Amino acid sequence: MYNWCYYHSSERHKTQGGIHMTADKVRLFFAGKGLADRITVRNEVSDTAEHSAAVIGCDIGQIAKTLSFLQDGKVVIILMSGEAKVDNKKYQHQFGLKSKMVPFAQVEDATGYAPGAVSPYLLKEGTEVYLDVSLRRYQVLYTAAGSLNSTVRLTMDELLDCTGAKGFVDVCKNWQPAAKAAS
């Protein structure tokens, strides 16, 4: 069984039965929605979209990676397709300010999740969640489920419902078929 503490030495990271306690909270959240069977826990750690897609056996675009940004003192989460990159011009047009990611060392304090395992569920109060339009081309998506070795499989409607997303934004590049062919 994967031991989260083995890979991350901070004393703040506690395990219960070998699984990070935030993963247990996410599991309980989905159990309450009747979706607990959608969570998969693996022995292998998947901390990047590329690795997650390989482990799951899906298209990298189906991995809804979760990026954390700071906006005027609040945290904003944007879920985007696994191969997408943030386009700073689009981000500034959408939000009216430059993109500023939460520094790696502050991710857990800002989101409640460790870097690489940020889940878009049960976030700290006041956190806003948006989905990038790059996700719309898929019927089934995968997100982190609170640990580096767990994912949850959801439809787009389920993802919208479970995240409480404020809506869709268009802040990414390198995901459109034409853009991928040109790069």
Predicted regions and their residues:
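Extended, low-hydrophobicity, polar/charged segments
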Residues: 2-8, 14-183
